[in-house]
Each structure stands twice: as structure tokens, then as C-alpha cells.
Amino acid sequence: MIKSSSLRLRKRIKKQVTDGIAHIHASFNNTIVTISDRQGNTLGWATSGGSGFRGSRKSTPFAAQIAAERCAEIVQEYGVKNLEVMVKGPGPGRESAVRALNAAGFHIISIIDVTPIPHNGCRPAKKRRV
């Protein structure tokens, strides 16, 4: 016989965050948009591939725009108004993702390029022959 236990389910209250950091990782194959609070705790994220784009369409500026819009929808539940944008990588979705976040109603405080640049560290991979 199954015993019915009285589980108390309470609705989880989302914390209110006004300032956030948008991390945009734009590679040649995909674009990942993550929005976190000032401490680095992730509030929401979206990718071009997760937004329904596959193959070579994942790496387009339009796919990055859609990913940024989806991430903005997720994060607006937290009450985020101001964003610092950190862009990493050489991909084609860099600029369009920033524009999409601006169009979503966020006040962009600053845009910082955090692409890792070696100070002559590891030897790079061989040139592609296509």
C-alpha cells in the first residue's frame, strides 16, 4: 500500500538582481550567451545550437541574435536592468549578440573584450588546407 506523504511544496522565490554580467562566447562554430550576477552566479544561458540552429547555421550572426534574445527572456524574471558585456572569441556572432541584448531593453554599462591572447605561449595548430 502506498502511503501518501504530505509534501509541502512552496513556490521558489527568484532573487531580484538589478546588475548583471553578460558573457558572450563567440566561436567559429557556435555562440554561447550566459548572464550572471556580479558574483558570477549564473542566472540564465542560451546557445545558437540550443535555439534550433544546426550545422553551419549555428555560426551565423542571426543565430547569435536569437540566442541572446532567448537568454534575455530567461533573465528578465530576475529583474536585471543593467548589464556589463564581456565578449570572448573571434566568431561572427559577437556584435549581433550585443545588439540583441541592447534591443531586449537592457542598459549596457560597458563592453569588454576578454578574448584570451597568448604572450607567445603554446605553438598554434597547423594551418588549415581546405
Swiss-Prot record:
Pfam families: Ribosomal_S11. The keyword Ribonucleoprotein applies. InterPro entries: Ribosomal_uS11, Ribosomal_uS11_bac-type, Ribosomal_uS11_CS, Ribosomal_uS11_sf. It comes from the Bacteria. Keywords: Ribonucleoprotein, Ribosomal protein, RNA-binding, rRNA-binding. Gene3D superfamilies: Ribosomal protein S11 (3.30.420.80). Belongs to the universal ribosomal protein uS11 family. Part of the 30S ribosomal subunit. Interacts with proteins S7 and S18. Binds to IF-3. This is Small ribosomal subunit protein uS11.
